[in-house]
Amino acid sequence: MVKEAVKIVAQNKKARHDYFIEETIEAGIVLSGTEVKSVRQGKLNLKESYASIVEGEVIVSGMHISPYEQGNIFNKDPLRDRKLLLHKSEINRLIGLTQQKGYTLVPVQAYLKRGMVKIELGVARGKKLYDKRDDIAARDAKREIDRKMKEQLR
């Protein structure tokens, strides 16, 4: 079985740092032609982006796609809201999940799959400061253990 080629264009590392990602879902995105060309060049930033559900549609706000150099009049506003493509049942499930206290939708990564731009949306719960410190401590401990194991194997 041939594995599909997926090219990751952008990741939202801040989302993984600030939130617990409970569940992820893949969604298509509505883009203009020059925006697709810009995304293929990797000129996409998810750092300050978030998703919301408005009138039964999932909208991504704050996602920055740099204007395409040769796009001139066809370029759109880099920070405009963009619609995500999901089935109605998926949107209804997301509505149910995000209505719980403390949950939100955050774009985790953007990638190209079979020539199409896809967004991985995460149903996320905010981290407290002590949760972030625990993650940093666990990461440092794992790094120290790996270092000791490497020294023992020499």
UniProtKB/Swiss-Prot annotation:
GO terms for molecular function: RNA binding. GO terms for cellular component: cytosol. It comes from Ruminiclostridium cellulolyticum (strain ATCC 35319 / DSM 5812 / JCM 6584 / H10) (Clostridium cellulolyticum). The keyword Cytoplasm applies. The gene is smpB. Disulfide bonds: none annotated. It holds the Pfam family SmpB. It comes from the Bacteria. It is found in: Cytoplasm. Belongs to the SmpB family. This is SsrA-binding protein. Required for rescue of stalled ribosomes mediated by trans-translation. Binds to transfer-messenger RNA (tmRNA), required for stable association of tmRNA with ribosomes. tmRNA and SmpB together mimic tRNA shape, replacing the anticodon stem-loop with SmpB. tmRNA is encoded by the ssrA gene; the 2 termini fold to resemble tRNA(Ala) and it encodes a 'tag peptide', a short internal open reading frame. During trans-translation Ala-aminoacylated tmRNA acts like a tRNA, entering the A-site of stalled ribosomes, displacing the stalled mRNA. GO terms for biological process: trans-translation. Its main location: cytoplasm. Keywords: Cytoplasm, RNA-binding. InterPro entries: SmpB (IPR023620), SsrA-bd_prot (IPR000037), SsrA-bd_prot_CS (IPR020081). CDD domains: SmpB (cd09294).
